[in-house]
Amino acid sequence: MKQKPEDWLNDVPDNQEDDEDDEIIWVSKSEIKRDAEALKDLGAELVDLGKNALEKIPLDDDLRAAVELAQRITREGRRRQLQLIGKLLRARDPEPIQIALDKLNNRHNQQVALFHKLEQLRDRLITEGDDVIPEILALYSHADRQQLRSLVRNAQKEKAANKPPKAARQIFQYLRELAETTN
């Protein structure tokens, strides 16, 4: 006996009915490979970190040991160790590790931006002289006007005499100290 199409739709058992909660999500093989490669790259970033930076990353003992071993290995062994680190990361939630790495990178970027700002202030101090000092005093209220003026005068003399920029380095160091005590 042949069933009409309408009949076989009604014959679906209760346990096979479509539930929106039980929706199956199909992931392509290429997407799985991309995710695995991204985790391997995350592992490579961990391996490239220094010892102090690595301590700030939340890793369990197995993963930390694998990363420390990969830091000591070279060439083909390192590649295989990176594969293992990627495998270990697939078994864990990589999000806290990625967040900690992003914080480390962001802190480094902020420090570089601060150094560029301080270098620009130093250059302006040397070229414009006393006109920039009130701006620095506004930024860093605990700055010593007299010391700044002395350093600026010395830097301008060195620049005019084509001497090495010893005073310019001292200005930068003083500005960096001011910035560190402010933060």
UniProtKB/Swiss-Prot annotation:
Region (Disordered): 1-21
Source superkingdom: Bacteria
BP term (GO), one: assembly of large subunit precursor of preribosome
Alphabetical UniProt keywords: Cytoplasm, Ribosome biogenesis, RNA-binding, rRNA-binding
Cellular component aspect of the GO annotation: cytosol
Subcellular localization, as worded in the UniProt entry: Cytoplasm
InterPro entries the UniProt entry points to: DarP, DarP_sf
GO molecular function: ribosome binding; rRNA binding
Keyword rRNA-binding: yes
Keyword Nucleotide-binding annotated: no
Family, per entry: Belongs to the DarP family.
HAMAP family, per the entry: DarP (MF_00765)
Role, per record: Member of a network of 50S ribosomal subunit biogenesis factors which assembles along the 30S-50S interface, preventing incorrect 23S rRNA structures from forming. Promotes peptidyl transferase center (PTC) maturation.
Descriptive protein name: Dual-action ribosomal maturation protein DarP
Organism, as annotated: Pectobacterium atrosepticum (strain SCRI 1043 / ATCC BAA-672) (Erwinia carotovora subsp. atroseptica)
